[in-house]
């Protein structure tokens, strides 16, 4: 039992339990849990309601759906939504990512493999090289590409017609997309953090699929501490299940859930030691701010991009920090949460 607890704590230190990026051993589980159609997809109602109309209209006209851009923090279901769209359209989905397409030839190979109406899903589309992106413009707009074959005096341009297709791009950093690329997406979907109610339903669905016994109150408590992110909720559920198995009788109730998450340093607002370190640094070293993002990153020994993409969005969404022109500022809520006295 002691070994299990030590291993539990060790894992929580080596890998941040609240990281909203996909971990290596979670890909199979995510595929298992993935809904197939919009009616099975929990949450993101605004995006779903729009897609229902656009998909139905495209099918009635027997046309390819307009290109779709899905943006928002990691772990909110952008990849899942892409698969759902393809299923709703009744077409194949070809999947790749921005970093995997290093040169124009890589993109041409992918495009040349598409059938009429297919969905091409490009994750991390903001990381496409500019040379590749420029080839994509005509492919998206007019369904053709012109490519250069050969080199020097023997080089020649080849025109290649493409079947109508739907490009679905996913990004965590929509601001990094160039204006010409962004303008070619006819449909945009902002994936937002999930409500506690939606996350509770997701937790209960996951528990049912994996034959776990969980009370509704425990599912709600887990949802509240999952940072509005299904990926994190499902990860925490597995760790709470382990705790219930070793330290209890296997039943996941609210008491077991609280003990397990407390052991993992996940507090009642869904903050972990890194989040708290950010807030404490702002309060103790800079009197609450304003403090620049670069300065803050150096003080907590994290990359600037990591703080900006992984930690800051949730802290802002929960009202613990605000952005100003002069830098980040800790709010009264942050002081109160950490037990500091707040003064104007």
Swiss-Prot record:
It comes from the Bacteria. One of its GO terms (biological process) is DNA repair. Gene3D superfamilies: 1.10.8.60, P-loop containing nucleotide triphosphate hydrolases, Winged helix-like DNA-binding domain superfamily/Winged helix DNA-binding domain. InterPro entries: AAA+_ATPase, AAA_lid_4, DNA_helicase_Holl-junc_RuvB, P-loop_NTPase, RuvB-like_N, RuvB_C, WH-like_DNA-bd_sf, WH_DNA-bd_sf. It catalyses: ATP + H2O = ADP + phosphate + H(+). DNA binds at residues 304, 323, 325, 328. ATP binds at residues 33-34, 75, 78-80, 141-143, 184, 194, 231. Residues 195-265 are annotated as: Small ATPAse domain (RuvB-S). It is found in: Cytoplasm. Residues 268-344 are annotated as: Head domain (RuvB-H). Residues 4-194 are annotated as: Large ATPase domain (RuvB-L). Mg(2+) binds at residue 79. Pfam families: AAA_lid_4, RuvB_C, RuvB_N. Keywords: ATP-binding, Cytoplasm, DNA damage, DNA recombination, DNA repair, DNA-binding, Hydrolase, Nucleotide-binding. Transmembrane segments: none annotated. GO terms for cellular component: cytoplasm; Holliday junction resolvase complex. It is an enzyme of class 3 (hydrolase). Its EC number is 3.6.4.-. GO terms for molecular function: ATP binding; ATP hydrolysis activity; four-way junction DNA binding; four-way junction helicase activity. PANTHER family: HOLLIDAY JUNCTION BRANCH MIGRATION COMPLEX SUBUNIT RUVB, PTHR42848. The RuvA-RuvB-RuvC complex processes Holliday junction (HJ) DNA during genetic recombination and DNA repair, while the RuvA-RuvB complex plays an important role in the rescue of blocked DNA replication forks via replication fork reversal (RFR). RuvA specifically binds to HJ cruciform DNA, conferring on it an open structure. The RuvB hexamer acts as an ATP-dependent pump, pulling dsDNA into and through the RuvAB complex. RuvB forms 2 homohexamers on either side of HJ DNA bound by 1 or 2 RuvA tetramers; 4 subunits per hexamer contact DNA at a time. Belongs to the RuvB family. Has 3 domains, the large (RuvB-L) and small ATPase (RuvB-S) domains and the C-terminal head (RuvB-H) domain. The head domain binds DNA, while the ATPase domains jointly bind ATP, ADP or are empty depending on the state of the subunit in the translocation cycle. During a single DNA translocation step the structure of each domain remains the same, but their relative positions change. This is Holliday junction branch migration complex subunit RuvB. It comes from Streptococcus mutans serotype c (strain ATCC 700610 / UA159). The gene is ruvB.
